[in-house]
Amino acid sequence: STMREITGKELERTLLKTQGRTWDGVPLPKLSVTDLKQDAIQLFKEKSVRRGRLTQEDVKVSDEMLMDNLHLIDENGYLIRAAMLAFYNDPEKWVTGAYVKIGFFGKSDSDLVYQDEVHGPLIEQVDKTVDLVYTKYMKALIDYEGVQRIEQFMFHKDAFREILLNAIVEHKLQVGGQAGLRKT
């Protein structure tokens, strides 16, 4: 048998695993449903109904019931980290770097031309980031049909949104830090 010392993130993952938890499932006893941003919860409800994930009846419940239905409240009645990331106004209060950073680089890795940061609840970060990337960072082929301007981007917005969501979730859950986008 060999003895091995583990520290840092590896130790945290091991301890959580022995408790049957994941990083995003850690309870936050000092956070309550009333601390969550109402606009973010409302945005979630609207998007869920519009995309057919939930019905109008599903979202006509109290915020506490919604969080419970989404499994964002643990067995002791505490909100978990995932709820805070998705709906809390300032998730950086709880998790350092819980924001998206976007950079436009010139000819080299050290040639940062300009950058932006997107803060707030994760549910809002995604839409704000997609809008920012499509208006400021991504180039489109432009065509005209009569007087109407038609922009054709390299990625369909829904596909880019999915890529962005995967990058954010993967980064936040494994590293617990900021997600970054790089455009060269």
Report each predicted region and the residues it spans.
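Conserved N-terminal catalytic/coupling substructures associated with nucleotide/phosphate chemistry
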Residues: 1-184
